[in-house]
């Protein structure tokens, strides 16, 4: 018992452990953007590789980098509301300021429906740089690197930035780059049952609606923008205006602009909206017990692909990497299914979810899971897990965290894919 306890202690480098507080979230307002949180550059030092081992293979899944809001109307809709109000002298000075900022952003935003931003490309370039720097042995002249993405342009371009940087570091690398419907069955897999769960009218949908509705009700916010209550009553959907500004405010960090809209919100307002959106994503795409495993099981084909490709590299004595590029709705189920540290926490109370699970930790822009494989001269294979380039644990014993025996990880992944 004592030995087992000590092994578990050795395995605990809990980057995502413990409960998150409201104060921690609000210490960086960008975190309230959830999936719009720009990739946080890692600062923690990585654990030294065990003596006699060197990296030879990397299995990766990454979300596309920072992007624009999905639809032009996400900007123009609320801008048009403020423009009309301005024509009727129904805007406060703060409202006029917000409109001016919107119009300045619109000059560059128009037409960029969900496109990758410059920052999004830079994120993947820098992640690639660090991957190469930390694992040069995996990217030698004989390395075989495969890169596959979903068919969405922002994923394809993210992949291009990533692989171009690898080639810049070693022009002799053999890299195959593909984007095809052929690979969507594991890069972006969603069962009919999980889709039905998200769309059907059930108890959690009503709970979600009320939580969001409560968060978006803000007389203070509306009065800060509009000076005519009668005009607002007849012409403005207050909740729509508040939500629109929340998304716009959240996305500014992805544009590398000095324009900000956070001043329109109180910290409590930002937190309440984030809490509602975070709960929705948690149930739709993560470890919520409400889905009874339907959502996280979407990752099964991806985990099987991870197993197959890892075994191919090991058995055939190859070096290189398997790079995969997709979306937030793919990496979050993967983390929950594999029970990556902190990503499998379960909570049914909507107002308590943020304490155990947060979108900005699981699926920020350019979020990525890396499995780094190492071997020694005896071909003993170790693997460690990096979430957003930070060392994390999985529910297996090890005497040398963050390094696990591949045979143990393989058995674990085979077990969970077969039992679900």
Residues of each region from the PLM?
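Bacterial Sec-dependent N-terminal signal peptides
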Residues: 1-22
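Signature for phosphate-centric chemistry
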Residues: 19-144, 150-322, 326-420
């Amino acid at each position: 018992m004592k030995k087992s306890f000590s092994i578990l202690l050795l395995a605990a480098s809990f980057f995502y452990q413990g409960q998150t507080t409201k104060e921690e979230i609000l210490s960086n307002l960008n975190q309230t953007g959830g999936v719009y949180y720009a990739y946080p550059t890692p600062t923690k030092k990585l654990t030294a590789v065990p003596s006699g081992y060197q990296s030879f293979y990397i299995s990766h899944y990454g979300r596309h980098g920072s992007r624009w809001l999905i639809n032009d109307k996400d900007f123009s809709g609320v801008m048009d509301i403020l423009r009309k109000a301005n024509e009727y002298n129904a805007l406060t000075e703060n409202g006029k300021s917000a409109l001016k900022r919107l119009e300045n952003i619109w000059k560059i935003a128009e037409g960029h429906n969900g496109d990758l931003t410059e920052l999004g490309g830079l994120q993947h370039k820098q992640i690639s740089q660090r991957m190469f720097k930390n694992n040069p042995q995996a990217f030698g002249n004989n390395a075989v690197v495969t890169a596959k993405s979903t068919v969405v342009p922002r994923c394809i371009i993210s992949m291009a930035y990533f692989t171009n940087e690898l080639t810049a570091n070693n022009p002799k690398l053999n890299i195959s780059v593909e984007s095809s419907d052929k690979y969507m069955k594991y890069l972006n897999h969603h069962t009919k049952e999980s889709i039905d769960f998200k769309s059907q009218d059930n108890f959690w949908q009503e709970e979600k609606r009320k939580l969001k509705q409560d968060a978006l009700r803000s007389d203070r916010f509306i009065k800060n923008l509009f000076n005519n209550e009668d005009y607002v009553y007849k012409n403005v959907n207050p909740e729509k205006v508040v939500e629109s500004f929340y998304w716009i405010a959240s996305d500014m960090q992805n544009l590398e602009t000095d324009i900000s809209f956070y001043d329109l919100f109180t910290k409590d307002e930002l937190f309440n909206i984030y809490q509602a959106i975070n709960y929705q994503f948690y149930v739709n795409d993560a470890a919520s017990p409400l889905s009874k495993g339907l959502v996280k099981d979407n990752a099964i084909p991806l985990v099987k692909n991870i197993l197959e490709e890892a075994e191919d590299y090991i058995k055939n004595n190859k070096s290189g990497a398997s790079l995969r590029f997709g979306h937030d709705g793919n990496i979050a189920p993967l983390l929950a299914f594999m029970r990556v540290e902190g990503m499998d926490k379960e909570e049914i109370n909507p107002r308590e979810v943020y304490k155990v699970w947060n979108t900005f930790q699981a699926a920020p822009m350019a979020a990525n899971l890396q499995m780094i494989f190492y071997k020694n001269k005896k071909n003993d294979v170790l693997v460690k897990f990096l979430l957003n380039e930070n060392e994390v644990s999985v529910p297996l014993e090890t005497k040398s965290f963050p390094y696990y025996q591949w045979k143990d990880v393989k058995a674990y992944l085979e077990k969970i894919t077969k039992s679900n």
